[in-house]
Amino acid sequence: MTTEKVNLLDFDRKGLRTFFAEELGEKAFRAEQVMKWIYHFGCDDFDQMNNINKQLREKLKAKCEIRAPYVSEAQHSADGTIKWAMRVGDQDVETVYIPEDDRATLCVSSQVGCALECKFCSTAQQGFNRNLRVSEIIGQVWRAAREIGLEKETGRRPITNVVMMGMGEPLLNMKNLIPALEIMLDDLGFGLSKRRVTVSTSGVVSGLEQMIGQIDVALAISLHAPNDKLRSEIMPINDRWNIEAFLEVVRRYIASSNANRGKVTVEYVLLDHVNDGTEHAHELAELLKRTPCKINLIPFNPYPGSPYKKPSNSRIDRFQKTLMQYEHTVTIRKTRGDDIDAACGQLVGDVIDRTKRTKAKQFDGQAIPVKTL
């Protein structure tokens, strides 16, 4: 019987030190040496770790591995965006690299599919299978960094920002999300600033409450409607945690956070003649008066079979100007990678649906059908 090897990408620094001490009988500083090799040098070969003694290298080869998701397909957009299908087990999740003049952002998935069934999101139409492991979340960053590193001659910018805005709801995978975030921030990991790592949530209040005092990163919230009636129609999670409950915990999180500089990013997808009217803009502006924020408007990105359309430029412009009358900071997200279906709301991957779509989801606490790892 073959014993499965331990994937070292599943450990943050604390977990790796504990594993080295308790399972390998090694001093904790050895764990930090190995961690530096993994994340600073993109190394997955123990034999290349030349400051590690041979005895430990042999022990690591016998018991451990460094295994990130691999790229099963890559698509390149005309604007420089790259979408990778990353193989996790027998399925794919999607990871998107978005280069800009002064930064390069990586959009990372947290689940295989999504159980929340937001009506405007193509990921939701794929159903839900399971949570990603720590190694499968941080492994997307590791693999992407390595892919970019292999293409230095093209002048691609190294990853400077990570956004948890890919497939899935991050706060329904807290067990694996937090260690992955810790590795992103750790000096021995990717060493990113807390202001350059963003978690986006559709409103999992219990998860956001757990984050308070536990991890400090930038926060973006998927609001997408100015009132509970409309939000429940397009985002069923609102039936479990309504807007008032959501914004209350958001205010508490940003009050405890240094990463957010006192403001949360409010994401609002504009759906033609659904939530993009002037009356919706006035209602949204009033709703957010007590929540320090900047508002990011996202014109809808169509996908095959979608019942919604992108609003006209005049409707988008009018919505923005109405919000600005209330002295809100309002931006319109530039669509990137839409020619390869890599834009916001277009990610689908390859998902074996484990949810029963003929039955309504019951948002009782976090009693959503989530297979944990």
From Swiss-Prot:
It catalyses: adenosine(2503) in 23S rRNA + 2 reduced [2Fe-2S]-[ferredoxin] + 2 S-adenosyl-L-methionine = 2-methyladenosine(2503) in 23S rRNA + 5'-deoxyadenosine + L-methionine + 2 oxidized [2Fe-2S]-[ferredoxin] + S-adenosyl-L-homocysteine; adenosine(37) in tRNA + 2 reduced [2Fe-2S]-[ferredoxin] + 2 S-adenosyl-L-methionine = 2-methyladenosine(37) in tRNA + 5'-deoxyadenosine + L-methionine + 2 oxidized [2Fe-2S]-[ferredoxin] + S-adenosyl-L-homocysteine. Keywords: 4Fe-4S, Cytoplasm, Disulfide bond, Iron, Iron-sulfur, Metal-binding, Methyltransferase, rRNA processing, S-adenosyl-L-methionine, Transferase, tRNA processing. The keyword Ubl conjugation does not apply. Its EC number is 2.1.1.192. [4Fe-4S] cluster binds at residues 114, 118, 121. Residues 100-339 form the Radical SAM core domain. Binds 1 [4Fe-4S] cluster. The cluster is coordinated with 3 cysteines and an exchangeable S-adenosyl-L-methionine. S-adenosyl-L-methionine binds at residues 168-169, 200, 222-224, 301. InterPro entries: Aldolase_TIM, Methyltransferase_A, RlmN_N, RNA_MTrfase_RlmN, rRNA_lsu_MTrfase_RlmN/Cfr, rSAM. Disulfide bonds join 107-344. It holds the Pfam family RlmN_N. GO terms for biological process: rRNA base methylation; tRNA methylation. The active site is at residues 94, 344. Its main location: cytoplasm. It comes from the Bacteria. GO terms for molecular function: 4 iron, 4 sulfur cluster binding; metal ion binding; rRNA (adenine(2503)-C2-)-methyltransferase activity; rRNA binding; tRNA (adenine(37)-C2)-methyltransferase activity; tRNA binding. Its cofactor is [4Fe-4S] cluster. It is found in: Cytoplasm. GO terms for cellular component: cytoplasm. Belongs to the radical SAM superfamily. RlmN family. Reaction proceeds by a ping-pong mechanism involving intermediate methylation of a conserved cysteine residue. Specifically methylates position 2 of adenine 2503 in 23S rRNA and position 2 of adenine 37 in tRNAs. m2A2503 modification seems to play a crucial role in the proofreading step occurring at the peptidyl transferase center and thus would serve to optimize ribosomal fidelity. This is Dual-specificity RNA methyltransferase RlmN. It comes from Vibrio cholerae serotype O1 (strain ATCC 39541 / Classical Ogawa 395 / O395).
